[in-house]
Amino acid sequence: MITIKKGLDLPIAGKPAQVIHSGNAVNQVAILGEEYVGMRPSMKVREGDVVKKGQVLFEDKKNPGVIFTAPASGTITAINRGEKRVLQSVVINVEGDEKITFAKYSTEQLNTLSSEQVKQNLIESGLWTALRTRPFSKVPSIESEASSIFVNAMDTNPLAADPSVVLKEYSQDFTNGLTVLSRLFPSKPLHLCKAGDSNIPTADLENLQIHDFTGVHPAGLVGTHIHFIDPVGIQKTVWHINYQDVIAVGKLFTTGELYSERVISLAGPQVKEPRLVRTIIGANLSQLTQNELSAGKNRVISGSVLCGQIAKDSHDYLGRYALQVSVIAEGNEKEFFGWIMPQANKYSVTRTVLGHFSKKLFNFTTSENGGERAMVPIGSYERVMPLDILPTLLLRDLIVGDTDGAQELGCLELDEEDLALCSFVCPGKYEYGSILRQVLDKIEKEG
């Protein structure tokens, strides 16, 4: 058991009831191009084309052989691009139930699959994109290998779904998925990371290693797991995958069909009935949240309130890796003498307002409660950083773009979500996730 003591469980209102319900029906889904770090698409479809579920939409030019497939059947209604023609989203109006089928196997056959059989089915179905590397958080090259594979079966993000509730319903598919992944690199460890008090189904596999984590957020982040179990570096890579994609892998290999259903948390202070809902990867979030939100100007976030993506316009869809939709109020109203008031209804990690001493949950908004200023090293980062790194020094090097110093201090182990708490507690209001990504891109390009 690994116990995480440094960190923060955000006391945010609107926690979801851990019971699965059917979500609003959606008739539009999309693949979000900017979710895939460094991806440059070679389009295989155009607007107006009718596609089947599992059909190839585009291939990554920079990672040949890695294809992205449709999560549902229907008509391509929009291919949205941003500056420099960066692909933002490929939108599908859902129609019919036509699908492409792939190789399938009996449960008994799964434990005898070759690495090539596993790889081929994952690539052809598009499920290869469920895997990501660390460092750099990219979809792995189909010719590459990993030191190990991590399966994350816990989630400590604010307002997250309890994985054990979801896995209770899909236990056989999850164990089948673990079996398949264990065959990808039979001689390499498959690490299953779960909460210490959770009841997660497992499989009797030779290379499966089970690890229990407990404590405050970020105990449930895969970056935390990798740091304590199999740390990475410039010459060492691991892969990781979330538990719902493991379910999809299990279903793919036993049914021959691409499984794109998601059970997500729909929660936050502005959600009328916070709960777990069934939906589909890439679901239109305006449709999914219709009649679900309190009145007022709200911000819908695909993912966690700490590190998710704003869902609007061409990005108004559930992300490929998102397991929650969070909704908070837009906090753009000015407060008279707000900086000097006791503020019993506001939360602070530095004891600057009375709300710090309260045990209640808070209706957080998008307000940063202050303006941008210089980075101030007052110990805030150290309180929320459980990894064996020096956060203040690392963040300073990230800000000034010192790639050599940042590498020495451990930036290659990190992803945007690993620095989300540092951004939250930062007195200078820096967004360290985007700064980290710029540095990682520079390191990958220049070394």
From Swiss-Prot:
* Record InterPro entries: NqrA (IPR008703), NQRA_2nd (IPR056148), NqrA_C_domain (IPR022615), NQRA_N (IPR056147)
> GO MF terms on file?
oxidoreductase activity, acting on NAD(P)H, quinone or similar compound as acceptor
Q: What is its EC number?
A: 7.2.1.1
Recorded hits in Pfam families, A to Z, give: NQRA_2nd, NQRA_N, NQRA_SLBB
Which reaction does this chain catalyze? a ubiquinone + n Na(+)(in) + NADH + H(+) = a ubiquinol + n Na(+)(out) + NAD(+)
State any GO BP term from the record: sodium ion transport
Principal EC category: translocase
For this UniProt record, the keywords arranged alphabetically read as follows: Ion transport, NAD, Sodium, Sodium transport, Translocase, Transport, Ubiquinone
Q: What's the superkingdom here?
A: Bacteria
Among PANTHER family, the record links this protein to:
NA(+)-TRANSLOCATING NADH-QUINONE REDUCTASE SUBUNIT A
Chain's role: NQR complex catalyzes the reduction of ubiquinone-1 to ubiquinol by two successive reactions, coupled with the transport of Na(+) ions from the cytoplasm to the periplasm. NqrA to NqrE are probably involved in the second step, the conversion of ubisemiquinone to ubiquinol.
Q: Which proteins does it associate with, and in what oligomeric form?
A: Composed of six subunits; NqrA, NqrB, NqrC, NqrD, NqrE and NqrF.
Question: Which family does the record assign?
Answer: Belongs to the NqrA family.
Its recorded name reads Na(+)-translocating NADH-quinone reductase subunit A
Species, as recorded: Haemophilus influenzae (strain 86-028NP)
Q: Which gene encodes it?
A: nqrA
